[in-house]
Amino acid sequence: MSLSSKDKATVKLFWGRMSGKAELIGADALSRMLAVYPQTKIYFSHWKSLSPGSSEVKKHGKTIMMGIGDAVTKMEDLERGLLTLSELHAFKLRVDPTNFKLLSLNILVVMAIMFPEDFTPMAHLAVDKFLCALALALSEKYR
C-alpha cells in the first residue's frame, strides 16, 4: 500500500497537531499492546515493571513515538531512512515483525481517543497507511 502525496500531507498535518502529546500516546499505546497482546511482554521481560504508567513503559513509549516522528520526516524513502532501526530490531532485538502491526493498531486507537475531532476517517486512513509502510520498512532486514 503506497502513500499518495495527499496521504503524506495528511500524516504530516496530523503529526503536527498531535506531536505535543506524542509521549502520552506512546505510553498509552505500548501499555495497551502489553495488556491486549500479552505475548509481546517477552521482549520487555528485563524491565522491573510492565504496568501501565511505569517508568519503563513511559520511556519506551516516548522512544517509539520519537522514532515515528523521525519516520514522518523520511516518508519519501522509509526503507533507507529506517535501515539502522530495521537492523536493530532484526539482528539484535529479534522482534517478530508482526508486533509492529500490533503496536500500530494500538497507536491508532489512542490517537482516535485523544483526538476525536482531528482523527477524521481520512486522517485515520492516511495514518494507518503510513504505519503499515513504517512496519514494512522496519521488517526490511528480516527478508
From Swiss-Prot:
Q: In which tissues is it expressed?
A: Red blood cells.
Q: Mind listing the GO biological process terms from this record? A: hydrogen peroxide catabolic process
Q: Which Gene3D superfamilies match?
A: Globins (1.10.490.10)
Matching CDD domains, A to Z? Hb-alpha-like
Q: Where does heme b bind?
A: 89
One Pfam family matching this protein: Globin
Gene Ontology molecular function: any one? oxygen carrier activity
Could you list this entry's UniProt keywords, alphabetically sorted.
Acetylation, Heme, Iron, Metal-binding, Oxygen transport, Transport
Domain named Globin: residues: 2-143
Q: Which residues carry this modification: N-acetylserine?
A: 2
Q: Which residues bind O2?
A: 60
Work out whether the entry's keyword set contains Heme: yes
| GO CC annotations on file | blood microparticle; haptoglobin-hemoglobin complex; hemoglobin complex
The similarity comment for this entry is: Belongs to the globin family.
**Known function:** Involved in oxygen transport from gills to the various peripheral tissues.
How is the subunit organization of this protein annotated in UniProt? Hb 2 is a heterotetramer of two alpha-2 and two beta-1 chains. Hb 3 is a heterotetramer of two alpha-2 and two beta-2 chains.
- What PANTHER family does its record include? HEMOGLOBIN FAMILY MEMBER (PTHR11442), HEMOGLOBIN SUBUNIT ZETA (PTHR11442:SF41)
Any further remarks?
Hb 3 displays a Bohr effect, which is enhanced by organophosphates, and a Root effect.
Task: Provide the protein name.
Answer: Hemoglobin subunit alpha-2
Question: What species was this sequence derived from?
Answer: Arctogadus glacialis (Arctic cod)
